[in-house]
């Protein structure tokens, strides 16, 4: 059963969300998407989670797709983990006494890592995919960018997302993928990553850190550094040979989904 609705975040911003309820629910998974994309790009992952008894909550980050807010714009990086907290709180309210896991990809991985750092112990476990937790690959050059915050740059991320040409083509032609990215958003990555690094020891949740070693957008070293610096006792790092940025969309994605499911099941 699927339910789509607008959820009011901490500052009144309306976030588009979708809840898919598992028939024989064992746990809940909340998915946080990446820069310029939308929740529909996680349909295959959600379907696998559902079939394993995980109710799935997804939402669109502010300024993305069907959510409110200035397009691809953040005034403060804290808006990312605080919007996510709104969704996590909703999931807890609707699923009391059920473990709630968090899955974040790329910018959504930053969001999930920041959530775990700011609100430790709220998630039963966190899965990070190609997460922007450091800035070893200076994709946007030195931060902050010396441009007005309201400047918008073309979204040129498409070529680096995946080795599957069909995924690259679908991304380019997807009307819900944002075509412009604000300097304000990019500069908040710089501020947020500095904060994440300074507070690494505060991240203590169980975590599965996943990265493709052919990722041309977010450096594999970001995940290695994050993994090495956090305070979690239960932590696993997995680097996939020959995979690009979107490991959840690579041809071997179902094998990776199974590994995510297995990791969650071991913590129930």
Show which residues each predicted segment covers.
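Short beta-strand/loop motif that positions the catalytic acidic residue
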Residues: 203, 209-211, 215
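Active-site glycine-rich loops that stabilize anionic/oxyanionic intermediates
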Residues: 26, 33-37, 213
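Catalytic active-site module of serine/aspartate enzymes centered on a nucleophile-bearing elbow/loop
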Residues: 236-268
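Short alpha-helix in the alpha/beta-hydrolase fold that links the catalytic acid
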Residues: 205, 219-228
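Short glycine-enriched nucleophile-adjacent loop
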Residues: 109-120, 126
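Catalytic nucleophile-loop/oxyanion-hole region of alpha/beta-hydrolase
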Residues: 36-39, 65-95
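Conserved alpha/beta-hydrolase
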Residues: 41, 46-69
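N-terminal cap/lid segment of alpha/beta-hydrolase-fold proteins
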Residues: 1-22
């Amino acid at each position: 059963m699927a339910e789509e609705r607008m959820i009011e975040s901490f500052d009144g911003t309306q976030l588009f969300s979708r809840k898919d309820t598992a028939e024989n629910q064992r746990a809940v998974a909340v998915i946080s998407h990446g820069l310029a994309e939308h929740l529909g790009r996680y349909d295959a992952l959600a379907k696998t989670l559902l079939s394993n008894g995980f109710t799935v909550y997804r939402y669109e980050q502010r300024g993305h797709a069907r959510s409110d807010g200035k397009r691809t714009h953040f005034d403060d990086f804290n808006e990312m983990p605080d919007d996510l907290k709104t969704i996590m709180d909703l999931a807890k309210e609707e699923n009391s006494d059920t473990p709630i896991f968090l899955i974040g990809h790329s910018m959504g991985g930053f969001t999930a890592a920041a959530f775990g750092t700011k609100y430790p112990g709220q998630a039963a476990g966190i899965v990070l995919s190609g997460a922007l937790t450091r800035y070893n690959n200076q994709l946007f050059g030195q931060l902050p960018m010396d441009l007005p915050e309201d400047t918008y740059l073309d979204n040129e991320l498409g070529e680096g997302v995946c080795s599957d040409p069909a995924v690259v083509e679908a991304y380019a032609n997807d009307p819900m993928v944002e075509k412009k990215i604000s300097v304000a958003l990019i500069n908040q990555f710089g501020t947020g990553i500095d904060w994440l690094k300074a507070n690494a020891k505060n991240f203590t949740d169980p975590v599965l850190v996943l990265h493709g070693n052919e990722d041309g957008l977010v450096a594999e070293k970001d995940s290695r550094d994050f993994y090495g610096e956090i305070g979690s006792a239960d932590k696993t790092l997995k680097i996939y040979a020959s995979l690009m940025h979107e490991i959840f969309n690579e041809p071997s994605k179902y094998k990776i989904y199974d590994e995510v499911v297995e990791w969650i099941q071991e913590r129930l």
